[in-house]
Regions:
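Bacterial N-terminal signal peptides that target proteins for export
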Residues: 2-9
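Bacterial N-terminal signal peptides
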Residues: 11-19
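Bacterial signal peptide processing site
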Residues: 21-24
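Functionally critical loop-and-helix segments that line ligand-binding/catalytic clefts
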Residues: 29-53, 192-256
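Substrate-binding cleft of extracellular glycoside hydrolase catalytic domains
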Residues: 43-63, 75-162, 168-170
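A short, Lys/Arg-enriched amphipathic alpha-helix followed by its capping loop at the start of a domain
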Residues: 64-70
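Residue-level detector of anion-binding/catalytic polar loops
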Residues: 71, 101, 174
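Catalytic domains of cell-wall/extracellular-matrix polysaccharide-remodeling enzymes
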Residues: 133-211
């Protein structure tokens, strides 16, 4: 398949999952947005829908979320070198049991050495051949009470590369990078072009916010409404051809 920025140019943009999460017969009609933005209207029409979650979502009824049309989930696992999301293991197993393709993500903390963060991720996220590749969440966190600072572009890239290598070694799968427009512009623009990206863009399509970046996943709202989840949740879409989703789950993003 040939994909553009919304349907990225790559055959490798889809995901290995031995336990196939089912067909796309459960469409996204039951998925909604509390505050929809016209700039991301196209995301609502895309067929491969997903979410990203953490302990903030509380208890999740994964079977209901799956039936409503949730095909994949990015699940917060670790942050820095000493924080494990208290709902990670519950969400990790719940998503798998419901047939939702899932990935574990690590939130990068700029005030801790990368090798300590890598070790923490490896200690808490079990390698799973059925899982999607792990995600490295790379963004500034200027509202943090413990680490609001920005470091240099060079130092940020060094930390990112150390984490990516460690996560790939641990899981056997090349990680996905999550970021937002500001961090991409200041640090990632023109870098790491051989990685899949998951991009935040809640008021416009990604190609309008990111210079020269192809994407695999798009986080298009933080005010999503999904059956099985109380309150609001981030919603995402996969950027490839939805007709290939089941085939893709069986073939790509395999262990190296």
């Amino acid at each position: 398949m040939t994909l553009n920025y919304r349907h990225l140019t790559m055959v490798g943009a889809v995901l290995l999952l031995a336990a196939c999460p089912g067909s796309l017969s459960a469409r996204s009609a039951k998925l909604a947005d509390a505050k929809p933005h016209d700039g991301v209207a196209s995301a609502h029409t895309m067929k491969v829908q997903g979410i990203d979650v953490s302990a903030w979502q509380g208890d999740i009824d994964w079977a209901r979320a799956r039936t409503a049309g949730t095909n994949f989930a990015f699940i917060k696992a670790t942050e820095g070198g000493d924080h494990l999301d208290p709902k990670f293991l519950e969400n990790w197993e719940g998503a798998k049991n419901a047939g939702v393709a899932r990935s574990a993500y690590h939130f990068l903390y700029w005030c801790r050495p990368a090798h300590e963060q890598a070790l923490w991720f490896m200690l808490n996220v079990p390698p799973d051949p059925d899982a999607l590749p792990p995600v490295l969440d790379a963004e500034w966190n200027t509202s943090s009470k413990t680490c609001p600072k920005k470091i240099s572009r060079e130092d940020a890239l060094d930390k990112i590369k150390i984490m990516l290598a460690a996560m790939e070694s641990h899981t056997g799968k090349k990680p996905i990078i999550y970021t937002d427009p500001a961090f991409h512009r200041e640090v990632l623009e023109g870098e790491l072009t051989d990685y899949h990206f998951w991009l935040r863009s809640v008021a416009a399509e990604p190609q309008d916010k990111y210079t020269g970046r192809r994407w695999t996943f798009w986080q298009f709202t933080t005010t999503g409404k999904v059956p099985g989840i109380a309150g609001r949740v981030d919603r995402n879409v996969y950027g490839g051809d939805d007709a290939d989703w089941d085939r893709v789950l069986q073939s790509l993003f395999a262990r190296r």
